[in-house]
Amino acid sequence: MLDVLIIGAGVSGVSCALILGSAQNKPFAMDKKIAIVAHQKASSLQNAIFNNAYGIPAGKLGSELLEESLEHLSKIYPHVLQIEGEKVLSISGEAGNFSITTNKSTYQAKII
């Protein structure tokens, strides 16, 4: 069973994964199993083009930023499992015992 399953790898999902990943050495987060369903197709950034964002080169595509964010996550926090090529179809259960069904598998998580 996962302790936390993050659904979606848009800006909010990846930010959540980065924050939880960075806490791996904290007493409250040690030995926690964290995963992210790395589906990004619904993110509004998919079609964005950045021209005036601080620190981002002009003409940078949002889809590139999303892809790079997952690469960054896997590089610095490899303990955060990235579930790729799957889309969530349903969620059932209650706090502490959720069942998340994707197009390929079913996952159990305490928190989603």
Report residues per predicted region.
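A conserved short coil-to-beta-strand element within the FAD-binding core of flavoproteins
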Residues: 84-97
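Beta1-alpha1 glycine-rich phosphate/pyrophosphate-binding loop at the start
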Residues: 2-67, 72, 79
